[in-house]
């Protein structure tokens, strides 16, 4: 997983010019007029062998009102919060301004890593400005000329050790997903890996700040519990907290909880802020095995809640929906029926996922949440034998044969499970491109019902008959060689 670099600084110091040079395209507007970049622009950057995400921000303006400049400033501060590294650019020809001093102080407080760059530093005329940049207290400035491409080697030297550190931490925190299976029955025994101290269950709790997410996490951790952390997470917005979550029957789950700023309340700002808020949730989801989507019982299933739940499904993570503040709900049964109906209607792709009511304030319902998380994790690891699948497929075909589009009969010949975490299945058939979406949904819903896989994402790939054996060349191959099973048409 690559890091994210935010280029920040006051207007017209050359941020967009450097952004365009790193991305290799003119994606950002460049002009001599200050404040041309009014939005956040994100691109895939390349610097020698480094690959990372770069964000071009609006200029940091020393304003506090609700004018356009004020919104640009808040948007930039939001980008600083979500970035792993901030490249703070100053103009070496102009020198350090009072605005630079103010926002250097902001960056010291808000940013995890700050790299200082003095741009427009070509020629002796910039020497005084480069020396003056030391007064910011952010270390030695890099001499850059974004327009001419000078100083990029020095930037690479600064970023390389940080990139290595993020890659190492990402490897430690990344969950094992899309696990390939082969024909050996031994894989069935290994499919469900129980959490251990070295490989704890990774859970992300996501939701709006006023949904009670922090209170719930504190209840799970326990006020007096000695934690092996907090550890810095992959982003400054995410920290992972380790604990042993004791269940109602005394069963203990070694667990790492990814706590993140999550999905913030809709601000009076443009859509980019909302997009960045969901971006925080994305980081938490990517490092989780089970995602707990926390809702407020008073205002459940808002647009942001639906987006993050759908995101977890698309990322292939197990999902548990928890409804908080249940202790102050008066008509509990009617509300529960309403929640279940809304869940089935708004999130059909997660049909059957656990929906648990809790009170983060009192701790009631945590036992149910504990069971639901374990159950979701078990289903996410589910393994079905090839013999069972093909007997099941024969019954499904007999009950509802596939259609014959344009008179072409579709034959579904063979089925096997190719992956787990989440479960993924390959069907060998004729005319895989002709199988309609409705028939794929019929098969996925049948798998979910008949093999007891409620709520978990299920992947289904239709493959042609050119390679009659879906395990060919794969039995002793590394997982990366299994992409041939997922390059075909995917139906969820």
UniProtKB/Swiss-Prot annotation:
Record keyword S-adenosyl-L-methionine present: no
InterPro entries associated with the record: G_ENGA, GTP-bd, GTPase_Der, KH_dom-like, KH_dom-like_a/b, P-loop_NTPase, Small_GTP-bd
Ranges for domain EngA-type G: 3-167, 201-381
Key word Ribosomal protein present: no
Basic residues bias spans: 472-492
Gene Ontology process terms (BP): ribosome biogenesis
Residues holding GTP 1: 9-16, 56-60, 119-122
Entry superkingdom: Bacteria
UniProt keyword list: GTP-binding, Nucleotide-binding, Repeat, Ribosome biogenesis
Residue numbers spanned by region Disordered: 462-492
Gene3D superfamilies per UniProt: 3.30.300.20, P-loop containing nucleotide triphosphate hydrolases
Domain KH-like: 382-468
Assembly, per entry: Associates with the 50S ribosomal subunit.
Function of the protein: GTPase that plays an essential role in the late steps of ribosome biogenesis.
Family in the record: Belongs to the TRAFAC class TrmE-Era-EngA-EngB-Septin-like GTPase superfamily. EngA (Der) GTPase family.
Protein name: GTPase Der
